[in-house]
Amino acid sequence: MLGKAIGIDFGTSSIKFYKNGEGIILHEKSVIAIYNKSHTFAVGNEAYEMYEKAPANIQVSYPVKNGVIADIGNMQSMIDYFFHELDGKKKLKGAEYYIAVPTDITEVEKRAYFDLITNTNLKPKKIHVVEKPVADALGMNLDITKSTGTLVVDIGANTTEISVMSLGGIVLSRLIPIGGNRFDEAIINKIKKDKSFVIGEKTAEEIKMTIGSAYVTDESIDVCGRNLVTGL
């Protein structure tokens, strides 16, 4: 990347902004809270804190589902908010933008990400749509120009992308509909079955991130929820 460049990863669960020379300048939950179906109430981590707790007149949602934009209006509101918050401090106007997208999405779905940046007031110098496996490999300083194959596995919230790269390109890539949210569901169901105890999605994610392991361990964590036997 030459000159001023901004990289953006629009994940289902979180959104990350990278600026060359500075590193990650924003890492927030990809969540928006809408008041009375029309007004932005909160965005990012602040909106995530309201998830599963908001009153009926506030809708908290994830605009990205399975790697693609599911709600273009809320997504535009969210990205406009983040750009407004960052632009004064990070001078984002006139930069080249690199947008990481899954390999197995349509050209129309890729265009939606492109249009998000075009529709802001940042006057981007140029917008590049980069396939996520390539962005992942470059971010990990992997040399994908060699003739030997490089396997990259990107586990997201709703999907997992498995790719093999060689000679600077993607040889094979598959996007499967299993991600971190499926692990959260498994935790919720396991605790409900074994302990007759109900927890929410946020609590399940906390358990996963704090003591989650592919191996059996003796670690434990205290969480809050509702006992199905007593109702408390």
PLM ranges: what are they?
Residues 1-155, 165-232:
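Nucleotide/phosphate-binding catalytic cleft detector across ATP-hydrolyzing
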